[in-house]
Amino acid sequence: MIQMQSYLGVADNSGAKEVMCIKVLGGSKRRYASIGDVIKVTVKEAIPRGKVKKGEVYDAVVVRTRSGVRRPDGSLIRFDGNAAVLLNNKQEPIGTRVFGPVTRELRSEKLMKIVSLAPEVL
């Protein structure tokens, strides 16, 4: 569960290392985001000569959370940390690679690019 002020790692090669959630998108009173949800983030830590700079604001899709996601068969998929993939204005990934596993819950039409770039789909 990601909320405002939550820090997330970045699971792509866009140049950002850490981002902070500044808004959960999808309704005025929406408080929490989970895997597959789009959030508005600001870059808190970035590498030199990357595609993004510290302080810039982007959309991002949550790909891993510590709280995990419950499957219909009752199993729970959990991760060691929270991570997101940065998106541009057209909702396409900024980076060309995705690091670490992602879940099958991302397999919607608009997020298939992230699933295809990921090394492992759980």
Curated annotation (Swiss-Prot):
Matches recorded under Gene3D superfamilies: Ribosomal protein L14
Cystine crosslinks: none
Record GO biological process: translation
Keywords, in A-Z order: Ribonucleoprotein, Ribosomal protein, RNA-binding, rRNA-binding
Keyword Ribosomal protein belongs to the record: yes
GO cellular component, one term: cytosolic large ribosomal subunit
GO MF annotations, alphabetized: large ribosomal subunit rRNA binding; structural constituent of ribosome
Keyword presence, Repeat: no
Quaternary assembly: Part of the 50S ribosomal subunit. Forms a cluster with proteins L3 and L19. In the 70S ribosome, L14 and L19 interact and together make contacts with the 16S rRNA in bridges B5 and B8.
Function: Binds to 23S rRNA. Forms part of two intersubunit bridges in the 70S ribosome.
Alphabetical list of HAMAP family matching this protein: Ribosomal_uL14
Family statement: Belongs to the universal ribosomal protein uL14 family.
The protein's name: Large ribosomal subunit protein uL14
Source species: Xylella fastidiosa (strain Temecula1 / ATCC 700964)
